[in-house]
Amino acid sequence: MTYYYGTSKSDLKDLKTTSMENGRIYLTTNRMCALVNAAKTYIDLFINKNFDYKEYTYFNICENLFEKIYKDKIGYIYSIEANENDFYCDAPDGIKPIMDSYYTLKDVTFTKKEKVNIYEEFLKLKERGIFSITEKNNIPKKYLEDTKRYYNNKYNNNYMTKDEINFFNKYIPDLLDLKWIYN
């Protein structure tokens, strides 16, 4: 079985259980989930459409946000071929695990590294009909309001790093109706 790990880090060779908080190394059997992980930023706008992790949409909360963030972003998808008996699932029997995620209690040495252009990879998935971009006027108003409230609360309670604040100032100032200044 192939297991994937998506990240922005270009220099991974392995993952050690001793460096993980709970001694578990989580990988996914779903390449698209690994791609979503490689695309992570300070705001997660990838929405799993059917709770089966086979189709995603991206909530484009500001005009051209997806393109602005990901146009030249590079990610890496690492993989290994491994015995299914070496991996476990947190989900109860008969329930599909979140993001097709499985864990091992053994160190992992990757056998393959794939450098991907995040934007181009998602456009390929869009052509196949398993990825879409939902424009702001089609996003539920409650989602936009809740997102705005969440990030404003995070900022107002000093839970944002300087890098997060700079990210929001650069890409999403319209969503939050304010220009944050790092204190």
Where are these regions (language model features)?
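Short, conserved phosphate/pyrophosphate- and ester-handling motifs at nucleotide-, phospho-/glycolipid
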Residues: 30
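ADP-ribose/NAD+-binding catalytic cleft of ART/PARP-like enzymes
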Residues: 1-26, 39-42
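Conserved NAD+-utilizing ADP-ribose enzyme module
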Residues: 35, 40-183
